From Swiss-Prot:
Belongs to the lyase 1 family. Argininosuccinate lyase subfamily. Its EC number is 4.3.2.1. Keywords: Amino-acid biosynthesis, Arginine biosynthesis, Cytoplasm, Lyase. Pathway: Amino-acid biosynthesis; L-arginine biosynthesis; L-arginine from L-ornithine and carbamoyl phosphate: step 3/3. The gene is argH. This is Argininosuccinate lyase. One of its GO terms (cellular component) is cytosol. Disulfide bonds: none annotated. Its main location: cytoplasm. GO terms for biological process: arginine biosynthetic process via ornithine; L-arginine biosynthetic process. It comes from Azotobacter vinelandii (strain DJ / ATCC BAA-1303). HAMAP family: Arg_succ_lyase (MF_00006).
Amino acid sequence: MSAEKTNQSWGGRFSEPVDAFVARFTASVDFDKRLYRHDIMGSIAHASMLEQAGVLSAAERDAIIDGLKQIQSEIEAGQFDWRVDLEDVHMNIEARLTERIGITGKKLHTGRSRNDQVATDIRLWLRDEIDTILGEITRLQQGLLEQAERHAEVIMPGFTHLQTAQPVTFGHHLLAWFEMLARDHERLVDCRKRVNRMPLGSAALAGTTYPIQREITCRLLGFEAVGGNSLDGVSDRDFAIEFCAAASLAMMHLSRFSEELVLWTSAQFNFIELPDRFCTGSSIMPQKKNPDVPELVRGKSGRVFGHLTGLLTLMKGQPLAYNKDNQEDKEPLFDAVDTLRDSLRAFADMVPAIKPRVEAMREAARRGFSTATDLADYLVRKGLPFRDCHEIVGHAVKYGVESGKDLAEMSLDELRRFSDQISEDVFAVLTLEGSVNARDHVGGTAPAQVRAAVARGRALLAAR
């Protein structure tokens, strides 16, 4: 092993430097440097608290805070030299602070460990990312509401088993995705409450002997509460797992939505058109217009599901308190956040631009005997038991398949072959409009109910 000298803040106990490969293997700065802003935010709050607790002088506090702000400017200007030998974002910033302001920089870490420091950084970062994601969900929901209102009367087939089932309106179908996203929003809001608890002050695992005032840093950093147990504060990552669980559900919804969009843009369905800016072509087939955005979102969902499993597996065997294993929490969490945020952004941009092919949807709804249930309900209203009506209509559908006729295309005489209870008024029931208008209750597909649901949706978004 190489004995190339490394620069470590903890080297006093060691008689030889860390091997150069091991230093690179154990370093996390390549990926955790994205926490720099929140690391500096936490350090500024910590320095302010140390001054109020009498650990730092006001001059020392001011020097530290000014130095940290200058370092943030260096990072954002691309002028900061990230060093692998300093392991991580925390030690890189602390070393640079000491370079800038001298020995006072070494006092910043008083009463603090990297264990509670990184746990705080991740929570601050994730809290901000959740807020961004919540905004993208709302933006996507707004697009769905606009489309649902615009197409409240456009009729399409509803499916079960991907077989034609009953007519629905396009607006009603889109509102199903609105409802799923509303639950995703609720889950993330709830998750944020548990993210927003402060571990800073837990130190390595047992707290600190310094007279820290955790309520001060809690207030300065905008946390809702101080963590109640120092061992728990530095060791658990359940908040990251919970986020990945909520993110997995949201990505599952987007993946299902993507599957429908992919199907609907195909020549076999031809239900919708996506703008060219959300599609790509083929390097060999000149006619192709591929729905890459929904296909990629569908594919990316697996990444987030995998990160959830990875984090659960990471944590399941760890004794209290902190273990180096937890360095592996960041990359899956970062990627889960990036994937969900970017997928939502793509959908929020794309959904308002979707154009339904109204006639193709209507023709598809007309095929497949989609008003068969309406005929059965019609016979129930004539006094027949539903099971008998089900069988009667089943025979009528069989006849329609053999003769190539939809129920609405059959003559009255043909329909009466299956039940003498059928009369001229049946044709109002068998129209697509009659079918959707009949389902005029809360949650139903009738255009009036779609518009009412849009109004409720707008009120929900306005209350956020």
